[in-house]
Amino acid sequence: VQALLRPLFITSWLIDDFLADQQFFGARRMLLSSASSKTAYGTAFQLAQREGIEVIGLTSPGNVAFCESLGCYHRVVTYDALDQIDGATPSVYIDFAGSVGLRQRIHAHFTGLAYSCSVGASHVGDLGGAGQLPGPRPVMFFAPAQVKKRHADWGAQGLNERLVAAWNQFSAAVSSGPQPWLV
C-alpha cells in the first residue's frame, strides 16, 4: 500500500488542504475528473470528510461502479452526462484527466465555476491547451508550493503529523473493511 499509494496520496492531501485553505473558493461542490484514478480517489476521500462539501466524481461508463464502490463520491456521473448536474451551482473543477475536450465542456456547462484546478493528465490522447475558456482560467496545482506554505505555517513536525494522521486513515480505509480496495 505504501509504495503504490503514499506518493499519490501526499498530492491528494495537499490538494484538499489547498482548497480548504482557500475556503473552496466560495464553492461547496467539487467536480473531480478521472474519478477512478488513485490521486482523484485520495482527494475525494479527504474532501468527503469535510462538512458541507459535495464531491462528484466524473468518469467513463466502465468505471462508474468502481467509483461508486469507493464510498467517497456523493455522486458519480459519466462524462457524457454532465448536463445532469446543475451548472449554475458554484463549483470547483479538479482536473486529473487533462483532456482539452472535457475541460472545454466543463467550462462551458458550469457557469458557476469558481475555480479550475489542473492536476494531471490521465487522458494522454487529448492533451493540450484549451484556448479561450469561459469562467476562471485553469491553474496548475503545484504541490511544492503548498508544502512550502504549510511548512512555514506549521513547521516540519506539524506538517508531518497532519500528513501521517491523514495517511493512516486513508491506508486503513483502502486495506480493511467489508470490501478492501487493496489487500
Annotate each language-model stretch with its function:
Residues 1-183:
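Terminal helix/beta-alpha structural elements that buttress the NAD(P)+-binding lobe
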